[in-house]
């Protein structure tokens, strides 16, 4: 495929709008429509029904983008910048992909990729479309929105014929061919509205935002702004760069908020507009605007130029936006508002979203334009929630901003969760597999779980208060709901699509809630199964893996015995993990679930040997002995293994420590040990060879450890403990290793820290001696965990080395399946079903989780409705097709795509929807340039299809056309119900 996108002719555009709206009530995929309340805000002699809209950028480039934004609640449109370089010449300068908005935003876009003439026509088409939509669909007042031009980048270019003509025609489009065509098409479509259509104003825009390149001299900026005010008589905003804050301020703010990895130097700060030049210039321009009877203000801010250092995007420099830009932009607002006593009007762009838009508006900062937030899942639909958040606030004409409120907002931004970067690098949200051509909706949380829990389903049951059925569903795959509800590594939450909104659904906490509230109901319903007579299983080890295996086997009626050397079952969770993380009562309840199925438990002494167990009649033996052997820390001094030390601490009733304890390691166990030492009175330190960003501990556990005041010594390796000191090598980070983490390398320097005891938490090991004593060769494992000894298996830590509880459960389930000979079969309750309507209602709604409350309400139900690629495409090039059987398919519309790459970031698969989804082509040339599987309609019956065996023509009217059944159904549905996509 090509990155070239086609403007849609106005008759086709309106055919799409009217057909889609009549068919399903959507507007270019926007499900939630804002119907104005009747309130409005005056600006530029016009009125806007809401203070929000798309910033000049990917969401305001094409007519359909603007239409989609309007339907969702936008009323101030800063249309994409035009300049003298345009069309193919400009598009050739834009690399692909050019947008990266998975977290903070980056882009390598520029001005419009269309010609200036095409851009003008797009904006005129959008203007006319919004006029008729407001009237016919009741979205609001036809005069309740404003178009704001954006032009750049130098005076000669702006005064040149191309851009000058554009400005003139936007100010009065009455004589343009496009405006005349729009009126003609609308009159044919809506003859009953001919008088209204005739009255549509040709004055598309009365205002402009000036955008200049980095390094533009202040004199040039002032000349252009003066020209726009005096000669063009346009209300004018001048867009400013964050570089006006100065290098030290920008660097300090970003570093303090966790963005220290973002690289930039001082050259833009030195070359861009300086504060001492800016203030007097803005004062002069403000006076000039007053003299002209116009409004003047500042657009804060432009995106922020940073270096591409990690292959984020193709070019060497990219432009930062979104949540990391907000603290810089609001500090710019703070300084401007104080300097001008609140009298300088500010148009905001720079990380605005649902969580801060009301505060900006209350402080007198508006209009507020957005880009990054509506490039994420939810897309344009996010605008309605923003609008609803402010529509009950007073709507007043601008009389000044509130410097005190802005100052408070700038200060709070530095500590706001929504703008702080996570301590550790974000995990990949993607599955390892390729997106299917068809039927691709999936719940990434389920795919991220080693046991593939039915997460959306049990969350829905919890949401409905059906905790008993929820817990039963959980325990179909998870034998340890209390343990995993408390200490699970919850990889599911790392995959959750809600992370692209604000934070993951609290899956683990909701599981625990289901366990606590549904426990009695579940226990009362469990029944002993019919016993299996030809199998008998011995499980050596009563930790999580052993308990889980016994549960799964007992449920199937397999006689099972657990042999545990300790006096209680529970393994590491009971004997090592501190009580402030998990209680014995929680472990006991999981054990009780297992015992309900008649599992025999033998405690307090070592298990018989494998040979003895076989003689006792056991047909299958599972070694679930864990990894208790301490990892080796080869240094001199007072060094203790973390497992044994933690066991001793947990046995003591009121342990008391003193002195300095240094924990070497950075996993969850290391965090536990440091917190225990700190709580018992010692000075606790964690020593790690790398930095916090690369620590293997869960971020939540790491943050708790930080919050409790444990000291961290990063980039250090222990050498020797002696006389209350620990000698350390100072490390530096080298090249990444196989794990992707940068390897620690000795710097040649050493230092000491206080240390009376070293606790080694560097990774426990399997007890190879125990295995060898039973003839088990650890390096010779057969399929499905079977060892070299027939009938003997290893699972959990004994199989994997130190692993997570849920990985042990996965091993246990697989072992039970081997023993029983078939997978466990179960039904999902009908009450767990979610309607398409309910799933769609959650789209674009941002909300934080409430503590101690079921978080099922926030689940996006991705397996019912995903559509991330649809939401995140600014051009609406990914479209949902509703099939006759009620299922949904995604079709990619080639003519509307410029290969920005944004959809790739949010697809839960390791795929690019713009390349990997079934594609609808507009012309044969487009199809020939592409490698996508897809279709070209040559007429109503003849199609050209590219699929696995190449490109072929097919006759849809033929009964034996050899089309794959699924593709034929999709193609016929597109032809019969969605022909507006290609006509």
Model-identified regions with their sequence ranges:
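Beta1-alpha1 glycine-rich phosphate/pyrophosphate-binding loop at the start
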Residues: 453-463, 471-472, 500, 504-508, ...
